[in-house]
Amino acid sequence: IGGSFAGLSAALQLARARRTVCVIDAGAPRNRFADASHGFFGQDGKNPQTMIAEARAQLLRYPTVRMLEGAATSAAAVAGGFEVGLSNGLTLDAARLVLAFGISDVLPEIPGLAGRWGKSVLHCPYCHGFEFSGRRLGVLQTMPMSAHQALLIADWGSTTLFLDGSDVPDS
C-alpha cells in the first residue's frame, strides 16, 4: 500500500525476487506540492511526479507487477495472509502486506500557508534546505519538538522560532 518512493522501491525489490506484486496508490504523495526532490543520486533536483512516473514505467516491465489506482480503506489479517479493502469497493487478498503510505502533513490554519506548502514553506531541511541556505528561516511552533527543529535548521541560515503560546521544553 503506497505508490510513491517507498512503495515503489519495495515493489521493485519484490518484483526482482519474482514475487507477485500489486501496488495500491491513492495518488497523493507527500511531496506532491514540491517542484523538485533532492537526495537521490541520479535524480537530485528532478520533479517528484516525473520520478514516480519513470519508476512506475520501470516496474511495469516486470510481468509480476500491477498498479492499482485507489485508496486502501481497510486491512485485516485473515487465514493465509491479509484482506485489503479499497475505496472503490474491491477487496484484495495478499500473503504479505507492505505498508509504505508515508506521512500526511497536517497544516495549521494560517491564511496563505497551504498555497506556499512545498515551495517556500517546507517540512524537511534535508530535502529542501540547501536551496534556502543563507536566507532568513523560520520555524512555527506546532509541537514540543519545534524548538529542536529551529536549532537544527540554524545550520542552513539565521533562524527565528515563532511561538504559538504553548510551552517550550527546557532541553
Question: Where are the model-predicted features located?
Answer:
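Rossmann-like dinucleotide/flavin-binding elements
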Residues: 1-23, 30, 123-169
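Glycine-centered flexibility sites
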Residues: 2-7, 39-42, 48, 102, ...
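N-terminal FAD cofactor-binding segment of flavoenzymes
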Residues: 5-22, 48-55, 61-62, 100-101, ...
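Short, glycine/charged-enriched secondary-structure capping and boundary segments
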Residues: 14-15, 36-39, 111-115, 152-155
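Short, function-defining helix-loop hinge/capping sites that tune catalysis or transport
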Residues: 21, 33, 108-110
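Structural signal for hydrophobic packing residues in well-ordered secondary-structure cores
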Residues: 25-28, 63
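N-terminal Rossmann-like dinucleotide/flavin-binding domain of flavoprotein oxidoreductases
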Residues: 32-91, 167-171
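FAD-binding core/adjacent interface of flavoenzyme oxidoreductases
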Residues: 66-135
